[in-house]
Structures are given as structure tokens and as C-alpha cells.
Amino acid sequence: MSNRVGLASSLKDGQKYMDLWPVRKELNSIFPEQRIIKATRFGVKVMPAIAAISVLTQMVFNNYQAMPQAVVMALFAISLPLQGMWWLGNRSNTKLPPALVSWYRELHEKITETGFALEPMKSRPRYKELAIILNRAFRQLDKSSMERWF
């Protein structure tokens, strides 16, 4: 998608990659993405509430001596989903290892053989291109043609 470097671009790429990656049980044993995506989505929903509760609890009980620890705990809770998105963003821009490159090429060829239009095959694909191909394969190929890989 882009060659930008930095925290903001990694977080943005991580969000896109989270939506792009096919959440399928067949991929669980091969890739850690599904576990990271599930934990990150859970963290996005839950961690802001935990952060607020940790600070508000100290305020309600007038325990201002523990406020610094509560703020640190809140910052840590908020950082957890950000860490997941950062990891996913970096992973999406990582070049595939040679074994996965051949798998990417086989899947790409199989999809184009069945007559579906795809963007041209990349010479040095990244994980985000693999996610696109896997998504397309699960949507458009039948189970018998996918049995070879899963």
C-alpha cells in the first residue's frame, strides 16, 4: 500500500491488514495473525474502559497516593491494542519468506486459471498481498481445490 515509515503509518497499515486478513480456522496453525487480530479487537473494545476504571476508582476512594500507579496502569491498558495494530502493520509490510512466496504464486495461478481477475503477481510479495490472495481463494475457489493446501 505504501512505503511510509513511522508509528502512525504502521498503525494505519495494521488496521487495514486486520480487515484484510481472512479469519479462517485453517490458517490458525500456520499464521499468528488470527490470534493477534482477535486480541487486538478485544483490546480496542475493553482496554479504554479498564483504563478509565483504574483512574476513576482511585479518585472515587480519594486514594490520590495511588494515582500515579493508576495512570501508568491506564497507559499500559491503552497501549495494548496499539501494540497489536503496530505488530500487524509491520507484519503486513514484511516480505514473504521463500516457502510462502511459492505458495503465494501457486494460489495466484490457481485463481487466475479459474477465470477470476487479479492484480498482477508481485515479484517480491508481502504479507498483505498474501492476505489478499488468501481472501480471494477462500471466497472463489471450491473446497476440493483448496484441499491441497489445507
UniProtKB/Swiss-Prot annotation:
Native source species: Vibrio atlanticus (strain LGP32)
Keyword set includes Ubl conjugation: no
InterPro entries (UniProt xref): UPF0208
Topology with respect to the bilayer: Multi-pass membrane protein
Family in the record: Belongs to the UPF0208 family.
One protein family per Pfam: DUF412
Subcellular location: Cell inner membrane
Transmembrane segments: 42-62, 70-90
GO cellular component: plasma membrane
Keywords attached to this entry: Cell inner membrane, Cell membrane, Membrane, Transmembrane, Transmembrane helix
Protein name: UPF0208 membrane protein VS_0999
Highest rank taxon of the organism: Bacteria
UniProt main location, coarse: membrane
